[in-house]
Amino acid sequence: MSLPPVIAIDGPTASGKGTVASLVAEKLGFHYLDSGALYRLVALASEKQGIDVKNGQELGLLVPKLLISFKNSQIFLNGENVTDAIRVESIGLRASALAVHPEIRSALVGLQRSFRQSPGLVADGRDTASVIFPDAILKVFLTATAAARAGRRYKQLIAKGISAKLEDLLQDLQERDARDSSRGVAPLLVADGAKVLETSDLSIDQAVKTVLDWY
């Protein structure tokens, strides 16, 4: 019995991969997995429990205890709606810091693969194309310049009423890019066979259409 098809979309922080992936899933009637949210959920849960971000072993043991669910673009952790709580910049930074631990990445692999259900799945996030779903029917690496990504993140935060400085966001993204590209476990890279989509000058609709055309 063949497994349901997977479209895997990867890329650097704030490249728009989440927005594009969720819209592609909606258009195709597929399930959607925001794997980056899983790391943010671990970041939030570990912060609440006072676990040191450097303690990979304890963080890895925490993962199987978490009850995680996605419902109508809302994200729940142990029954609590944490959709907004995990999008706070401090949680994003914490998630990036704890993602370097192999214990966490291996603990999350099985959880991510469990989202592969009929009629199909669009998965976005780090190493979805290279590690989690290497047999994905379509692999896309979504990218944009750091300046373009910082500008988008700035607009998102301001629209939500969250104060932010463009210079700080740009510096944060550049630091995160460097950390994500150089880490020993699952560094940020273009997976074998992936199509690269440069979105600096594309609208969301144009990016979605391109992915659908490739599929």
From Swiss-Prot:
Annotated protein name in UniProt: Cytidylate kinase
GO biological process: pyrimidine nucleotide metabolic process
Lineage, top ranks: Bacteria, Pseudomonadati, Pseudomonadota, Betaproteobacteria, Burkholderiales
Keywords, in A-Z order: ATP-binding, Cytoplasm, Kinase, Nucleotide-binding, Transferase
Positions annotated to bind ATP: 11-19
Subcellular location: Cytoplasm
Catalysed reactions, semicolon-separated: CMP + ATP = CDP + ADP; dCMP + ATP = dCDP + ADP
Enzyme class (EC, first level): transferase
Gene designation: cmk
Entry EC number(s): 2.7.4.25
GO MF entries: ATP binding; CMP kinase activity; dCMP kinase activity
Top-level taxon in the UniProt lineage: Bacteria
Family per record: Belongs to the cytidylate kinase family. Type 1 subfamily.
GO cellular-component term (any): cytoplasm
